[in-house]
């Protein structure tokens, strides 16, 4: 079984939600709900409102995603 193709988009964190989830506004104007990737949690990388992040999303559900990088 092949791994599904993930779409990556840059965005800005708009709001912090419970359980390490965030409301992210993508550069194309859409807002999604995203959670932090496990490696970011493990390395205790903090994400705050206003941070620029990279979000990867599955092609099946374009309303949810995973934050896999925080830009410096």
From Swiss-Prot:
Gene Ontology molecular-function annotations: ribosome binding; rRNA binding; translation initiation factor activity
Gene Ontology CC terms, in alphabetical order: cytosol
Keyword flag Zinc-finger: no
Protein's cellular compartments: Cytoplasm
Domain of life of the organism encoding this protein: Bacteria
Keyword RNA-binding: yes
Coarse class of the protein's main subcellular location: cytoplasm
Keywords, ordered alphabetically: Cytoplasm, Initiation factor, Protein biosynthesis, RNA-binding, rRNA-binding
CDD domains noted in UniProt: S1_IF1
PANTHER family: TRANSLATION INITIATION FACTOR IF-1, CHLOROPLASTIC (PTHR33370:SF1)
Subunit structure: Component of the 30S ribosomal translation pre-initiation complex which assembles on the 30S ribosome in the order IF-2 and IF-3, IF-1 and N-formylmethionyl-tRNA(fMet); mRNA recruitment can occur at any time during PIC assembly.
Record protein name field: Translation initiation factor IF-1
Taxonomic lineage from the root: Bacteria, Pseudomonadati, Pseudomonadota, Alphaproteobacteria, Rhodobacterales
Encoding gene (name): infA
């Amino acid at each position: 079984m092949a791994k599904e193709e993930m779409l990556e988009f840059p965005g800005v964190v708009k709001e912090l939600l419970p359980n390490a989830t965030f409301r992210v506004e993508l550069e194309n104007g859409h807002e999604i709900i995203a959670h932090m990737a496990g490696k970011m949690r493990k390395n205790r990388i903090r994400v705050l409102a206003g941070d620029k992040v990279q979000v990867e999303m599955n092609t099946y559900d374009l309303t949810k995603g995973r934050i896999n990088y925080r830009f410096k």
